[in-house]
């Protein structure tokens, strides 16, 4: 009896179960927990290592290929027998279904691509594609093109309608293990034994228009090259949204790169041996990986962590592949068995989608989106602006959340990280409430006005637009803060309870079409203004005092400079006198001393003026330091 242990993480209640698999049986003999992956079917027929497996898009079959040079097609209906395609000479490395499920493509050691009709009595079309073994293939999203990767260090694009060669991608310095076409059919990614991942630009519109009238060759260009891996790149994949590139390597690692910013955003030390294959769930939430350490691992890309580990008696697990709906995934390896697993992710995905569609209120604190509390999306810092008269500070009122979502930057990626959003200029409150001001007493905050306040929203992993109005309401429920305001943190029970107590006595806001308004009987309380506002008021008052002192001193300096210049002119006029009596000479001698002192004072005063000008450009602290030093010198 072969034994497979399925170890799940805390997401699956941290339970471990075991299932015993017979050599030819396709049933599970031991009950497993509800949300754990479970073996559904196993197919035996190959005589050598299984190298690749793929699902029929209509979920009628699963195809597998092997080093025994045979392609098997396994039917899920028990009454239908499997059939096999024979024709390759040597190992078959890859098998793929076309998007419509009517064609099966296979390639291998014999340097050929074979296109099979998905019937028992199949006709085969042969494309002599490369000068070396063909390692992998990828269909375009519309099924019209096929990309092949080869040991001849190139990738080639083929038009399936007439089996015609379109273009070649040359740039790698070693075998090309994997190539894939992006979902929007504009990019091609490739991974090679030269430890690099390359990204290529490809415009399919040029293929069918401009270049098809010439020689059907496509002008391509290499966009970028990534060399983060330390060993052979075994496979590359595009994320379903087309913004990220996922690569696996023999260096035991899996890396996810944002192709818009060319930045590495996730990195996993995935296996204890080389990673042979990866597959992305259609939702983009989960990633499956297979390695030579006898393990299959499932990763939650939203949380950035491993959630399942499946142990197998296969020394090398060479392939893993999700089906089109994400309900199943297939694996194969050195035991020559093609295994089909039920993911049981549907319940987890339903829970996620249900939370995204609705919000739950507890003590006037709303939370939503995958268990992330809504209050963790808010920061208690304020955004302030100084009035033209420099006598008031206005705390900008809350902005409309819809524009915040629409104006977010391209560097934001729904991968579990928190990003700052761009500010919106569209107000959420009505015009009457925008004009509402909280007039503070002159003794407490001299010359200061406070208008509203604002919480700056940071976006977490929110993709469903249905919960935006709920977040607007959650944001505006927290519009009035107090002196005991604390920073939000999702992992602190104490802070959560304090937040709930803080907001429990605050007024409800009425939300209508994304616009939040105060109740008619509500009057904001001045004494509950945030302590941060007090700090702003005190700081600005100190700045005003320092500026007044600085201006007075600069005025005195200018007067002294004028007096010194007048004394200097008077002394020069006296020197032009031709005859002087002894008494006048004594007077001139006195003027000379005064002139020397005045020149020195004039130079010093001008230096002080320059110092003040430089200090004013730097900061108020430097100005104050210059004032104190000059007063001490005098």
From Swiss-Prot:
Compositionally skewed regions (Polar residues) per UniProt: 1-35, 397-407
Q: InterPro entries of this UniProt entry? A: G-protein_beta_WD-40_rep (IPR020472), WD40/YVTN_repeat-like_dom_sf (IPR015943), WD40_repeat_CS (IPR019775), WD40_repeat_dom_sf (IPR036322), WD40_rpt (IPR001680)
In this chain, the stretch annotated as Disordered covers 1-40, 397-439
- Major place of residence: cytoplasm
Q: Name one GO biological process term.
A: centrosome cycle
The record's section on SMART domains has: WD40
Give a short account of what the protein does. Required for structural maintenance of centrioles, ciliogenesis, and cilia-based motility.
Name this protein carries in UniProt? POC1 centriolar protein homolog
């Amino acid at each position: 009896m072969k034994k497979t242990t399925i170890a799940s993480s805390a997401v699956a209640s941290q339970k471990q179960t075991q299932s015993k698999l017979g050599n030819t049986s396709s049933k599970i003999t031991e009950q497993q927990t509800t949300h754990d992956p479970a073996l559904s079917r196993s197919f035996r027929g190959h005589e050598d290592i299984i190298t690749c497996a793929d699902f029929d898009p209509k979920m009628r079959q699963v195809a597998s290929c092997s080093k025994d040079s045979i392609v098997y097609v396994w039917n899920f209906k028990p009454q239908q027998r499997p059939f096999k395609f024979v024709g390759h000479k040597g190992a078959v490395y890859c098998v793929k279904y076309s998007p419509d499920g009517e064609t099966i493509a296979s390639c291998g050691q014999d340097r050929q691509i074979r296109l099979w009709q998905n019937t028992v009595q199949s006709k085969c079309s042969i494309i002599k594609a490369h000068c070396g073994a063909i390692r992998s293939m990828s269909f375009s999203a519309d099924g019209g093109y096929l990309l092949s990767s080869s040991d001849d260090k190139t990738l080639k694009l083929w038009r399936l309608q007439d089996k015609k060669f379109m273009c070649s991608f040359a740039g790698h310095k070693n075998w090309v293990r994997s190539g894939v076409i992006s979902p929007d059919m504009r990019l091609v990614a490739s991974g090679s034994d030269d430890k690099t991942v390359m990204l290529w630009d490809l415009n399919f519109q040029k293929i069918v228009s401009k270049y098809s009238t010439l020689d059907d060759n496509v002008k391509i260009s290499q966009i970028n090259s990534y060399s983060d891996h330390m060993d052979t790149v075994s496979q590359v994949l595009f994320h379903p949204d087309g913004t990220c590139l996922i690569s696996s390597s023999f260096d035991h690692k899996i890396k996810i790169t944002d192709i818009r910013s060319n930045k590495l955003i996730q990195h996993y030390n995935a296996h204890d041996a080389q990673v042979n294959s990866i597959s992305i769930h259609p939702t983009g939430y989960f990633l499956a990986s297979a390695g030579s350490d006898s393990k299959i691992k499932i990763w939650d890309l939203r949380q950035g962590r491993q959630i399942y580990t499946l142990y197998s008696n296969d020394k090398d697990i060479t392939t893993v592949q999700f089906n089109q709906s994400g309900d199943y995934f297939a694996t194969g390896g050195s035991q020559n068995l093609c295994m089909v697993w039920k993911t049981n992710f549907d319940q987890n995905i339903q829970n996620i989608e249900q939370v995204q569609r609705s919000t739950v209120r507890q003590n006037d604190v709303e939370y939503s989106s995958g268990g992330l509390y809504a209050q963790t999306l808010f920061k208690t810092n304020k955004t302030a602006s100084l009035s033209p008269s420099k006598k008031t500070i206005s705390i900008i009122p809350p902005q409309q959340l819809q524009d915040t979502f629409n104006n977010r930057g391209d560097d934001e990626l729904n991968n579990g990280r928190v990003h700052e959003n761009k500010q919106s200029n569209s107000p959420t409150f009505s015009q009457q409430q925008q004009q509402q001001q909280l007039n503070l007493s002159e003794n407490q905050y001299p010359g200061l006005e406070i208008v509203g306040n604002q919480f700056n929203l940071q976006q977490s992993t929110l993709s469903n637009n249905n919960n935006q109005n709920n977040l607007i309401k959650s944001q505006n429920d927290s519009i009035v803060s107090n002196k005991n305001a604390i920073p939000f943190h999702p992992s602190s029970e104490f802070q959560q309870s304090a937040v709930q107590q803080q907001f429990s006595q605050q007024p409800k806001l009425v939300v209508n079409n994304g616009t939040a308004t105060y109740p008619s009987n509500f009057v904001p309380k001045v004494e509950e203004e945030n302590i941060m506002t007090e700090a702003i008021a005190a700081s600005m008052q100190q700045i005003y005092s320092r500026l007044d002192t600085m201006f007075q001193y600069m005025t005195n300096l200018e007067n002294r400079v004028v007096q010194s210049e007048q004394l200097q002119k008077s002394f020069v006029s006296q020197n032009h006198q031709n005859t002087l009596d002894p008494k006048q000479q004594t007077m001139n001698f006195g003027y000379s001393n005064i002139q020397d002192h005045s020149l020195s004072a004039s130079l010093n005063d001008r230096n002080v003026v320059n110092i003040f000008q430089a200090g004013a450009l730097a900061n108020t602290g430097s100005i104050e330091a210059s004032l104190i030093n000059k007063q001490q010198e005098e």
